[in-house]
Amino acid sequence: MLLLAVAAFFSAAAMRVCDGLLPRIGHEFGITPGTAGGVVLVFALAYGLSQLVFGPLGDRFGKARMVGIALLGCMLLSLVAALSEGFQGLLFARAAWGAAAAGVIPLSMAWIGDAVPYEERQPTLARFLVGTISGMMAGQLAGGLFADAAWGWRGAFMLMALGYGLVGCLLLARLRHIRVAPPVAGSGWGVFGRQVRTVLANPWSWRVLGITLAEGVLLMGPMAFLPAYLHQRFGLSLSVASGLIAIYAVGGIVYALFARRLVAALGESAMVAIGGLLMGAGFLAWWLSPVAWTAGPVALVVGFGTYLLHNTLQTNATQMAPAARGTAMATFAFCLFGGQAIGVALAGRAFDHWGAGVMLAVPAAGMPLVALAFARARRRRD
Protein backbone atom coordinates (compact mmCIF):
# COMPACT_ATOMS: atom_id res chain seq x y z
CA MET A 1 0.00 0.00 0.00
CA LEU A 2 2.82 2.42 0.87
CA LEU A 3 4.68 1.75 -2.38
CA LEU A 4 1.49 2.22 -4.38
CA ALA A 5 0.87 5.53 -2.60
CA VAL A 6 4.42 6.69 -3.43
CA ALA A 7 3.92 5.59 -7.03
CA ALA A 8 0.73 7.66 -7.09
CA PHE A 9 2.70 10.61 -5.67
CA PHE A 10 5.01 10.75 -8.70
CA SER A 11 2.24 10.05 -11.20
CA ALA A 12 0.12 12.86 -9.75
CA ALA A 13 3.10 15.22 -9.68
CA ALA A 14 3.50 14.71 -13.43
CA MET A 15 -0.09 15.86 -13.96
CA ARG A 16 0.48 19.21 -12.22
CA VAL A 17 4.17 19.96 -12.68
CA CYS A 18 3.61 21.83 -15.95
CA ASP A 19 0.94 24.21 -14.57
CA GLY A 20 3.48 26.63 -13.12
CA LEU A 21 5.86 26.06 -16.02
CA LEU A 22 3.49 27.20 -18.79
CA PRO A 23 4.67 30.86 -18.87
CA ARG A 24 8.32 29.69 -18.82
CA ILE A 25 7.72 27.18 -21.62
CA GLY A 26 5.80 29.82 -23.57
CA HIS A 27 8.64 32.32 -23.18
CA GLU A 28 11.33 29.84 -24.24
CA PHE A 29 9.45 28.73 -27.36
CA GLY A 30 7.87 32.11 -28.22
CA ILE A 31 4.25 31.02 -27.76
CA THR A 32 1.30 32.08 -25.58
CA PRO A 33 0.50 30.36 -22.26
CA GLY A 34 -2.65 28.95 -23.85
CA THR A 35 -0.60 27.33 -26.61
CA ALA A 36 1.99 26.14 -24.09
CA GLY A 37 -0.92 24.44 -22.32
CA GLY A 38 -0.62 21.82 -25.04
CA VAL A 39 1.90 20.03 -22.81
CA VAL A 40 -0.91 19.53 -20.28
CA LEU A 41 -3.50 18.71 -22.94
CA VAL A 42 -1.52 15.97 -24.72
CA PHE A 43 -0.50 14.38 -21.40
CA ALA A 44 -4.13 14.24 -20.26
CA LEU A 45 -5.39 12.99 -23.63
CA ALA A 46 -2.80 10.21 -23.86
CA TYR A 47 -3.38 9.36 -20.20
CA GLY A 48 -7.09 8.96 -20.82
CA LEU A 49 -6.80 6.98 -24.04
CA SER A 50 -4.20 4.61 -22.62
CA GLN A 51 -6.60 3.54 -19.88
CA LEU A 52 -8.27 1.42 -22.55
CA VAL A 53 -5.00 -0.54 -22.79
CA PHE A 54 -3.83 -0.66 -19.17
CA GLY A 55 -7.18 -1.66 -17.68
CA PRO A 56 -7.43 -5.00 -19.52
CA LEU A 57 -3.67 -5.59 -19.12
CA GLY A 58 -4.01 -5.12 -15.37
CA ASP A 59 -6.88 -7.59 -15.21
CA ARG A 60 -4.93 -10.11 -17.30
CA PHE A 61 -1.34 -9.86 -16.02
CA GLY A 62 -1.66 -8.35 -12.55
CA LYS A 63 -2.30 -4.79 -11.50
CA ALA A 64 0.79 -4.27 -9.31
CA ARG A 65 3.09 -5.70 -12.00
CA MET A 66 1.69 -3.32 -14.62
CA VAL A 67 2.09 -0.37 -12.22
CA GLY A 68 5.80 -1.18 -11.84
CA ILE A 69 6.31 -1.48 -15.60
CA ALA A 70 4.46 1.80 -16.15
CA LEU A 71 6.72 3.57 -13.63
CA LEU A 72 9.85 2.50 -15.50
CA GLY A 73 8.27 3.72 -18.74
CA CYS A 74 7.61 7.08 -17.08
CA MET A 75 11.26 7.27 -16.03
CA LEU A 76 12.49 6.87 -19.61
CA LEU A 77 9.92 9.20 -21.15
CA SER A 78 10.37 12.00 -18.62
CA LEU A 79 14.07 11.94 -19.54
CA VAL A 80 13.14 12.16 -23.23
CA ALA A 81 10.92 15.16 -22.41
CA ALA A 82 13.74 16.84 -20.48
CA LEU A 83 16.05 16.51 -23.50
CA SER A 84 13.53 17.82 -26.07
CA GLU A 85 14.91 20.54 -28.35
CA GLY A 86 11.68 21.93 -29.83
CA PHE A 87 8.09 22.42 -28.73
CA GLN A 88 6.76 19.71 -31.06
CA GLY A 89 9.26 17.25 -29.65
CA LEU A 90 8.23 18.22 -26.13
CA LEU A 91 4.57 17.64 -27.00
CA PHE A 92 5.39 14.18 -28.36
CA ALA A 93 7.39 13.27 -25.26
CA ARG A 94 4.70 14.53 -22.89
CA ALA A 95 2.07 12.52 -24.78
CA ALA A 96 4.16 9.35 -24.50
CA TRP A 97 4.82 10.12 -20.83
CA GLY A 98 1.09 10.51 -20.23
CA ALA A 99 0.43 7.17 -21.92
CA ALA A 100 2.88 5.44 -19.58
CA ALA A 101 1.59 7.25 -16.48
CA ALA A 102 -1.88 5.90 -17.24
CA GLY A 103 -0.88 2.59 -15.70
CA VAL A 104 -0.20 3.88 -12.18
CA ILE A 105 -3.08 5.45 -10.22
CA PRO A 106 -6.15 3.72 -11.75
CA LEU A 107 -4.62 0.24 -11.48
CA SER A 108 -3.52 0.99 -7.92
CA MET A 109 -7.12 1.92 -7.05
CA ALA A 110 -8.35 -1.22 -8.80
CA TRP A 111 -5.96 -3.28 -6.67
CA ILE A 112 -7.45 -1.63 -3.56
CA GLY A 113 -10.89 -2.55 -4.89
CA ASP A 114 -9.78 -6.19 -5.16
CA ALA A 115 -8.17 -6.32 -1.73
CA VAL A 116 -10.40 -4.17 0.51
CA PRO A 117 -14.11 -4.77 1.39
CA TYR A 118 -16.52 -2.07 0.16
CA GLU A 119 -17.33 -0.89 3.72
CA GLU A 120 -13.66 -0.01 4.26
CA ARG A 121 -12.91 1.11 0.74
CA GLN A 122 -13.72 4.84 0.96
CA PRO A 123 -11.40 5.42 3.98
CA THR A 124 -8.72 3.22 2.38
CA LEU A 125 -8.93 5.11 -0.90
CA ALA A 126 -8.75 8.33 1.11
CA ARG A 127 -5.45 7.21 2.67
CA PHE A 128 -4.17 6.24 -0.77
CA LEU A 129 -5.26 9.67 -1.97
CA VAL A 130 -2.83 11.28 0.46
CA GLY A 131 -0.09 10.08 -1.89
CA THR A 132 -1.95 11.35 -4.95
CA ILE A 133 -2.81 14.69 -3.39
CA SER A 134 0.67 15.22 -1.96
CA GLY A 135 2.05 14.51 -5.43
CA MET A 136 -0.21 17.14 -6.96
CA MET A 137 0.95 19.66 -4.37
CA ALA A 138 4.62 18.77 -4.83
CA GLY A 139 4.28 18.87 -8.62
CA GLN A 140 2.61 22.27 -8.51
CA LEU A 141 5.28 23.65 -6.15
CA ALA A 142 8.14 22.10 -8.11
CA GLY A 143 6.81 23.53 -11.36
CA GLY A 144 6.73 27.04 -9.92
CA LEU A 145 10.15 26.74 -8.29
CA PHE A 146 11.80 25.35 -11.41
CA ALA A 147 10.05 27.99 -13.55
CA ASP A 148 11.96 30.67 -11.63
CA ALA A 149 15.21 28.66 -11.52
CA ALA A 150 17.99 28.27 -14.07
CA TRP A 151 17.20 24.60 -14.77
CA GLY A 152 13.62 25.38 -15.78
CA TRP A 153 11.31 22.65 -16.98
CA ARG A 154 14.19 20.36 -17.95
CA GLY A 155 15.36 20.18 -14.34
CA ALA A 156 11.84 19.42 -13.12
CA PHE A 157 11.47 16.52 -15.55
CA MET A 158 14.89 15.06 -14.66
CA LEU A 159 14.03 15.10 -10.96
CA MET A 160 10.83 13.22 -11.67
CA ALA A 161 12.71 10.60 -13.73
CA LEU A 162 14.85 9.82 -10.69
CA GLY A 163 11.79 9.30 -8.49
CA TYR A 164 10.05 7.09 -11.05
CA GLY A 165 13.08 4.84 -11.37
CA LEU A 166 13.49 4.31 -7.63
CA VAL A 167 9.83 3.53 -6.92
CA GLY A 168 9.42 1.34 -10.00
CA CYS A 169 12.39 -0.85 -9.09
CA LEU A 170 11.24 -1.19 -5.46
CA LEU A 171 7.71 -2.13 -6.49
CA LEU A 172 8.81 -4.77 -8.99
CA ALA A 173 11.16 -6.22 -6.37
CA ARG A 174 8.22 -6.58 -3.93
CA LEU A 175 5.78 -8.24 -6.35
CA ARG A 176 5.86 -11.67 -4.71
CA HIS A 177 4.62 -10.15 -1.42
CA ILE A 178 1.66 -8.31 -3.00
CA ARG A 179 -1.77 -9.93 -2.99
CA VAL A 180 -3.19 -10.35 -6.50
CA ALA A 181 -6.67 -11.08 -7.82
CA PRO A 182 -7.18 -14.09 -10.11
CA PRO A 183 -6.42 -13.01 -13.70
CA VAL A 184 -9.24 -12.57 -16.19
CA ALA A 185 -9.16 -15.56 -18.52
CA GLY A 186 -8.26 -15.09 -22.17
CA SER A 187 -6.61 -12.23 -23.99
CA GLY A 188 -7.02 -9.97 -26.97
CA TRP A 189 -9.67 -7.55 -28.16
CA GLY A 190 -12.48 -10.03 -27.60
CA VAL A 191 -11.82 -10.08 -23.88
CA PHE A 192 -11.33 -6.32 -23.84
CA GLY A 193 -14.70 -5.82 -25.52
CA ARG A 194 -16.37 -8.19 -23.08
CA GLN A 195 -14.90 -6.34 -20.10
CA VAL A 196 -16.00 -2.94 -21.42
CA ARG A 197 -19.49 -4.30 -22.09
CA THR A 198 -19.58 -5.58 -18.51
CA VAL A 199 -18.82 -2.08 -17.23
CA LEU A 200 -21.30 -0.32 -19.50
CA ALA A 201 -24.09 -2.85 -18.93
CA ASN A 202 -24.64 -1.29 -15.51
CA PRO A 203 -26.85 1.83 -15.95
CA TRP A 204 -25.27 3.40 -12.88
CA SER A 205 -21.90 3.29 -14.65
CA TRP A 206 -23.15 5.78 -17.23
CA ARG A 207 -24.12 8.23 -14.49
CA VAL A 208 -20.78 7.91 -12.70
CA LEU A 209 -18.78 8.22 -15.92
CA GLY A 210 -20.79 11.19 -17.18
CA ILE A 211 -20.27 13.15 -13.96
CA THR A 212 -16.58 12.22 -14.04
CA LEU A 213 -16.24 13.56 -17.59
CA ALA A 214 -17.88 16.83 -16.51
CA GLU A 215 -15.50 17.08 -13.55
CA GLY A 216 -12.54 16.78 -15.89
CA VAL A 217 -13.84 19.50 -18.22
CA LEU A 218 -15.05 22.01 -15.62
CA LEU A 219 -12.51 21.55 -12.83
CA MET A 220 -9.25 20.06 -14.07
CA GLY A 221 -9.10 22.05 -17.31
CA PRO A 222 -9.21 25.57 -15.81
CA MET A 223 -6.99 24.52 -12.87
CA ALA A 224 -4.02 24.19 -15.24
CA PHE A 225 -4.04 27.94 -15.94
CA LEU A 226 -4.52 29.27 -12.40
CA PRO A 227 -0.79 29.94 -11.73
CA ALA A 228 -0.54 31.78 -15.06
CA TYR A 229 -3.72 33.72 -14.15
CA LEU A 230 -2.31 34.87 -10.79
CA HIS A 231 1.05 35.68 -12.43
CA GLN A 232 -0.66 37.78 -15.09
CA ARG A 233 -3.27 39.51 -12.91
CA PHE A 234 -1.28 40.25 -9.75
CA GLY A 235 2.32 40.16 -11.00
CA LEU A 236 3.26 37.29 -8.68
CA SER A 237 6.34 35.20 -9.39
CA LEU A 238 5.52 31.80 -10.82
CA SER A 239 6.84 30.07 -7.71
CA VAL A 240 4.55 32.11 -5.42
CA ALA A 241 1.55 31.74 -7.74
CA SER A 242 2.08 27.97 -7.95
CA GLY A 243 2.54 27.78 -4.18
CA LEU A 244 -0.79 29.48 -3.55
CA ILE A 245 -2.65 27.12 -5.87
CA ALA A 246 -0.79 24.13 -4.41
CA ILE A 247 -2.67 24.74 -1.14
CA TYR A 248 -5.53 23.08 -3.04
CA ALA A 249 -3.88 19.79 -2.13
CA VAL A 250 -3.98 20.64 1.58
CA GLY A 251 -7.77 20.71 1.32
CA GLY A 252 -7.62 17.21 -0.13
CA ILE A 253 -5.41 16.01 2.71
CA VAL A 254 -7.84 17.48 5.26
CA TYR A 255 -10.57 15.47 3.57
CA ALA A 256 -8.47 12.30 3.65
CA LEU A 257 -7.79 12.68 7.38
CA PHE A 258 -11.49 12.98 8.22
CA ALA A 259 -12.96 10.81 5.44
CA ARG A 260 -14.27 8.04 7.69
CA ARG A 261 -16.10 10.51 9.96
CA LEU A 262 -17.41 12.54 7.03
CA VAL A 263 -18.89 9.47 5.35
CA ALA A 264 -20.53 8.38 8.61
CA ALA A 265 -21.87 11.84 9.47
CA LEU A 266 -22.99 13.12 6.06
CA GLY A 267 -23.42 10.19 3.70
CA GLU A 268 -22.39 10.21 0.05
CA SER A 269 -25.21 12.39 -1.29
CA ALA A 270 -24.64 15.27 1.13
CA MET A 271 -20.86 15.07 0.64
CA VAL A 272 -21.26 15.43 -3.11
CA ALA A 273 -23.68 18.36 -2.86
CA ILE A 274 -21.54 20.26 -0.37
CA GLY A 275 -18.43 19.60 -2.45
CA GLY A 276 -19.99 21.05 -5.58
CA LEU A 277 -21.13 24.19 -3.79
CA LEU A 278 -17.67 24.72 -2.28
CA MET A 279 -16.01 24.35 -5.69
CA GLY A 280 -18.39 26.79 -7.33
CA ALA A 281 -17.89 29.35 -4.56
CA GLY A 282 -14.12 28.94 -4.85
CA PHE A 283 -13.96 29.64 -8.58
CA LEU A 284 -16.18 32.67 -8.04
CA ALA A 285 -13.80 33.93 -5.34
CA TRP A 286 -10.75 33.44 -7.58
CA TRP A 287 -12.49 35.50 -10.23
CA LEU A 288 -13.75 38.37 -8.07
CA SER A 289 -11.16 38.73 -5.29
CA PRO A 290 -9.27 42.05 -5.54
CA VAL A 291 -6.17 40.79 -3.70
CA ALA A 292 -3.76 37.95 -4.41
CA TRP A 293 -3.39 36.44 -0.94
CA THR A 294 -6.95 35.09 -0.88
CA ALA A 295 -6.04 32.61 -3.64
CA GLY A 296 -4.40 30.27 -1.10
CA PRO A 297 -7.30 29.91 1.37
CA VAL A 298 -9.71 29.64 -1.56
CA ALA A 299 -7.58 26.85 -3.03
CA LEU A 300 -7.83 24.96 0.28
CA VAL A 301 -11.64 25.21 0.23
CA VAL A 302 -11.81 24.12 -3.41
CA GLY A 303 -9.49 21.18 -2.70
CA PHE A 304 -11.65 20.01 0.20
CA GLY A 305 -14.79 20.35 -1.92
CA THR A 306 -13.19 18.54 -4.83
CA TYR A 307 -12.46 15.44 -2.82
CA LEU A 308 -15.89 15.35 -1.23
CA LEU A 309 -17.12 14.77 -4.78
CA HIS A 310 -14.17 13.01 -6.36
CA ASN A 311 -13.55 10.34 -3.74
CA THR A 312 -17.25 9.49 -3.78
CA LEU A 313 -17.07 9.08 -7.55
CA GLN A 314 -13.98 6.88 -7.20
CA THR A 315 -15.65 4.68 -4.59
CA ASN A 316 -18.72 4.23 -6.80
CA ALA A 317 -16.47 3.46 -9.77
CA THR A 318 -14.84 0.55 -7.93
CA GLN A 319 -18.27 -1.13 -7.87
CA MET A 320 -19.26 -0.56 -11.50
CA ALA A 321 -17.98 -4.03 -12.53
CA PRO A 322 -16.32 -6.04 -9.73
CA ALA A 323 -15.48 -8.87 -12.14
CA ALA A 324 -13.47 -6.49 -14.37
CA ARG A 325 -12.42 -3.84 -11.88
CA GLY A 326 -9.21 -2.90 -13.71
CA THR A 327 -11.19 -2.10 -16.85
CA ALA A 328 -13.83 -0.27 -14.80
CA MET A 329 -11.26 2.00 -13.14
CA ALA A 330 -9.52 2.49 -16.47
CA THR A 331 -12.81 3.61 -18.02
CA PHE A 332 -13.32 5.97 -15.09
CA ALA A 333 -9.86 7.49 -15.60
CA PHE A 334 -10.43 7.67 -19.37
CA CYS A 335 -13.48 9.86 -18.78
CA LEU A 336 -11.73 12.02 -16.17
CA PHE A 337 -8.63 12.74 -18.23
CA GLY A 338 -10.46 12.89 -21.53
CA GLY A 339 -12.55 15.56 -19.85
CA GLN A 340 -9.39 17.30 -18.65
CA ALA A 341 -7.99 17.36 -22.19
CA ILE A 342 -11.20 18.97 -23.45
CA GLY A 343 -11.18 21.37 -20.50
CA VAL A 344 -7.56 22.42 -21.05
CA ALA A 345 -8.24 23.12 -24.73
CA LEU A 346 -11.30 25.23 -23.91
CA ALA A 347 -9.72 26.99 -20.92
CA GLY A 348 -6.56 27.78 -22.89
CA ARG A 349 -8.60 29.36 -25.66
CA ALA A 350 -10.62 31.34 -23.13
CA PHE A 351 -7.47 32.51 -21.33
CA ASP A 352 -5.78 33.68 -24.53
CA HIS A 353 -8.77 35.18 -26.35
CA TRP A 354 -11.67 35.94 -23.98
CA GLY A 355 -10.01 36.57 -20.65
CA ALA A 356 -9.75 34.70 -17.39
CA GLY A 357 -13.24 35.81 -16.32
CA VAL A 358 -14.88 33.43 -18.77
CA MET A 359 -12.47 30.65 -17.81
CA LEU A 360 -13.43 30.98 -14.13
CA ALA A 361 -17.14 31.79 -14.47
CA VAL A 362 -18.01 28.55 -16.27
CA PRO A 363 -16.84 26.20 -13.48
CA ALA A 364 -18.23 28.59 -10.86
CA ALA A 365 -21.68 27.95 -12.29
CA GLY A 366 -21.19 24.45 -13.67
CA MET A 367 -19.62 22.49 -10.82
CA PRO A 368 -22.49 23.04 -8.35
CA LEU A 369 -25.02 21.98 -11.00
CA VAL A 370 -23.08 18.82 -11.85
CA ALA A 371 -22.58 17.87 -8.20
CA LEU A 372 -26.21 18.48 -7.26
CA ALA A 373 -27.34 16.31 -10.18
CA PHE A 374 -25.15 13.44 -8.96
CA ALA A 375 -26.29 13.92 -5.35
CA ARG A 376 -29.92 13.65 -6.46
CA ALA A 377 -29.17 10.50 -8.45
CA ARG A 378 -27.28 9.02 -5.49
CA ARG A 379 -30.25 9.62 -3.17
CA ARG A 380 -32.60 7.90 -5.61
CA ARG A 381 -30.25 4.93 -5.88
CA ASP A 382 -30.08 4.63 -2.08
Give the role of each language-model region:
Residues G89, Y118-P123, R127-R176:
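Helix-loop-helix hairpin linking two adjacent transmembrane segments in secondary transporters
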Residues L49-E85:
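Conserved MFS/SLC helix-loop-helix module at the cytosolic interface between two early adjacent transmembrane helices
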Residues R176-V208:
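Juxtamembrane intracellular "pre-TM" segments in multi-pass secondary transporters
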Residues S269-L313:
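C-terminal transmembrane helical hairpin of 12-TM major facilitator-type secondary transporters
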